[in-house]
């Protein structure tokens, strides 16, 4: 019996399974409690149980394997990991662990890890010799992440504009600057779908902080990847815990030479959460931001890097502007120069219902010559010269109309050459 397999089953089927196993009153329980009861029943019959999760080490030295299905929220189906196992395998918060588990004994509340089979999808012996993330050498992004799918659909137009306006590479630290209702969520969904389609080798994680519950459900259904969320009805401490778990998991995977991509919506709300949680230093910036509050969200965003030893961590985050809040403006100003790719969205374009509402002239990537071939780069620069005199609305309408005539950007450049 596998714990992860049970978590993927809908609640109605779990209740049916529980009824067959002779369990009662399951309909009134939370999903995690139902899973706990079913596993306990199977364990009594002597069946082997396996489970996995992401390790969170607490201050007392022991830890728990949390599940991404419940967005790393503590629950009855968490798996206890003893301090001796943590020391033996040199485990750290964020390690993805799978292994054999046992049911709780008399007086215990949680399932416990008996045997570690894999650490970060690798043998436990290999995990011990990994170089710490902080000791890895950061480089400029030099391997392109293409967004274009080449199927000629209207959704692909967004990806193609993105490829032209600001190319994304493995290890990019990108900021999508978005006013309200400019289509940032749609843009993130497009990026997520393009990555899943073109780069299935990358580990994709979508982190939604302070979002609406219905948007979380929509994102989970659309994105082939891990969607971790903390909705607006959760406390700030929960937003912080979720983001820490996601970034620690990403760092551990990069240590194992994996390419990880985090799409964060939004870094402004994350910074607000840290501002609430961090102890008051007495120094307050404009808009009510504590002087120490932005250190940890900057550390989150600054973790994005291309690594010389292999692997990369890409973070594409949205920053909110024009919300009427002075605090949001201060947070944006603090993050403004930290990224190496910027993609401003325009409210004017979105109000005319032209999507994607990208401000083409103001968007761009640093060191884009490392990501694009020289001939393609020349064509992109010529396109910028053509578009530069136009207003932001005219530029976007012109570009979308021309791109709609072709299926791929190469065809578009050929058409440009002929005309």
Curated annotation (Swiss-Prot):
Keyword ATP-binding (UniProt) = yes
Q: What is its EC number?
A: 3.6.4.-
Q: In which domain of life is the source organism classified? A: Bacteria
Q: Name one GO biological process term.
A: DNA-templated transcription termination
| A GO term for molecular function | RNA binding
All copies of domain Rho RNA-BD, residue ranges: 48-123
The record ties this protein, via Pfam families, to: ATP-synt_ab, Rho_N, Rho_RNA_bind
Q: Where is this region: RNA-binding 2?
A: 284-288
InterPro entries assigned to the protein according to its UniProt record, in alphabetical order:
AAA+_ATPase, ATPase_F1/V1/A1_a/bsu_nucl-bd, CSD, NA-bd_OB-fold, P-loop_NTPase, Rho-like_N, Rho_factor_ATP-bd, Rho_N_sf
- Report whether Ribonucleoprotein shows up as a keyword of the record: no
Q: Which GO terms describe its cellular component?
A: cytosol
The alphabetized UniProt keywords are: ATP-binding, Helicase, Hydrolase, Nucleotide-binding, RNA-binding, Transcription, Transcription regulation, Transcription termination
What residues does the record give for site: RNA-binding 2? 326
Q: Which residues bind ATP?
A: 169-174, 181-186, 212
What are the boundaries of the region RNA-binding 1?
61-66, 78-80, 108-110
Cystine pairs annotated here are none
Q: What does this protein do?
A: Facilitates transcription termination by a mechanism that involves Rho binding to the nascent RNA, activation of Rho's RNA-dependent ATPase activity, and release of the mRNA from the DNA template.
| Assigned protein family | Belongs to the Rho family.
Q: How does it assemble?
A: Homohexamer. The homohexamer assembles into an open ring structure.
The protein's name is Transcription termination factor Rho
Annotated organism of origin: Buchnera aphidicola subsp. Baizongia pistaciae (strain Bp)
Lineage at the top is: Bacteria, Pseudomonadati, Pseudomonadota, Gammaproteobacteria, Enterobacterales
The gene for this chain is rho
